Amino acid sequence: MAFTTTAVVAPRGAKITGQSSTCAIQNGKTVAVGTSKQVGSFKPVFAAAKPAKETTFSVSCSAASDDVPDMGKRKLMNLLLLGAIAGPVAGAGGPFVSFLVPPKAGGGAGAGQAAKDALGNDVKVSSWLETHKPGDRSLAQGLKGDATYLIVKEDGTLENYGLNAVCTHLGCVVPWNASENKFMCPCHGSQYDRTGKVVRGPAPLSLALAHVSVLEDGVVAFEPWTETDFRTNTAPWWK
């Protein structure tokens, strides 16, 4: 939960109050206030002064419920996860933003949308496989700009499908946990197996699939997956 306040300095013993959308502190004790979905708390900073009977101070607060991650949260998670896999880069703030904007055209001849790396460049299959070991699942920018996992098979070649990293519960980006051999959402605990099939809720559906191919110039490309989901033998819910 995000929770911010305006700093308040009050005499010792003061009573600081507010409405349901603000923070309340009584007698120096932390008091959680707000609606059932927007609750937060913080401790006041008191000045060394004589106790006051009662003094009211205005406290500016804002709370964002974790029940529904907004677009800002989703973009931030994309930024952090994609930045982490790319490693330190000078002026990193700019390059990583390329994952948060619509993809650019390009990537050679043939059908499909070119996968983009953390710098916004087309992903070349040769260089990708040089830096990603068998079993690796790392993010690239996929269809509609969504973070999408490219999978390296045990034989060192690229899997012919990619996994949309957006959790089907409330839209958080789901990281791959290699030690657990599954995708584990940090927001509400949903889990998916190595193929992206949901194995634990609250997520109701498996991660969306995308076709992965290599164009004539060696650029990796994504294409929409419209046929049966091989993991569930059902029509794709994302169609």
Curated annotation (Swiss-Prot):
Compartment annotation: Plastid, Cyanelle thylakoid membrane
- Where does the Rieske domain lie? 125-221
Its needed co-factors are: [2Fe-2S] cluster
Which segment is the transit peptide? 1-60
Principal place of residence: plastid
| Binding positions for [2Fe-2S] cluster per the UniProt entry | 167, 169, 185, 188
Pfam families assigned: Rieske, TM_PetC
In its UniProt record, a GO molecular function of this protein is: 2 iron, 2 sulfur cluster binding
Membrane-crossing residue ranges in chain numbering: 81-101
Q: Which residues form a coiled coil?
A: none
| Co-factor remark | Binds 1 [2Fe-2S] cluster per subunit.
Disulfide bonds, paired cysteine numbers: 172-187
Keywords from the UniProt entry: 2Fe-2S, Cyanelle, Disulfide bond, Electron transport, Iron, Iron-sulfur, Membrane, Metal-binding, Plastid, Thylakoid, Transit peptide, Translocase, Transmembrane, Transmembrane helix, Transport
What catalytic activity is recorded? Answer: 2 oxidized [plastocyanin] + a plastoquinol + 2 H(+)(in) = 2 reduced [plastocyanin] + a plastoquinone + 4 H(+)(out)
Tell me which GO cellular component terms the UniProt record holds.
Answer: cyanelle thylakoid membrane
For membrane topology, the record states:
Single-pass membrane protein
Quote the EC number: 7.1.1.6
What more does the entry say? This protein is 1 of 2 subunits of the cytochrome b6-f complex that are encoded in the nucleus.
Functionally, this protein is described as follows:
Component of the cytochrome b6-f complex, which mediates electron transfer between photosystem II (PSII) and photosystem I (PSI), cyclic electron flow around PSI, and state transitions.
Tell me, how does this one assemble? The 4 large subunits of the cytochrome b6-f complex are cytochrome b6, subunit IV (17 kDa polypeptide, petD), cytochrome f and the Rieske protein, while the 4 small subunits are petG, petL, petM and petN. The complex functions as a dimer.
- Family recorded in the similarity comment: Belongs to the Rieske iron-sulfur protein family.
Task: Name the HAMAP family on file.
Answer: Cytb6_f_Rieske
What protein does this entry describe?
Answer: Cytochrome b6-f complex iron-sulfur subunit 1, cyanelle
Q: Which organism is it from?
A: Cyanophora paradoxa
- Name the gene that codes for it: petC-1
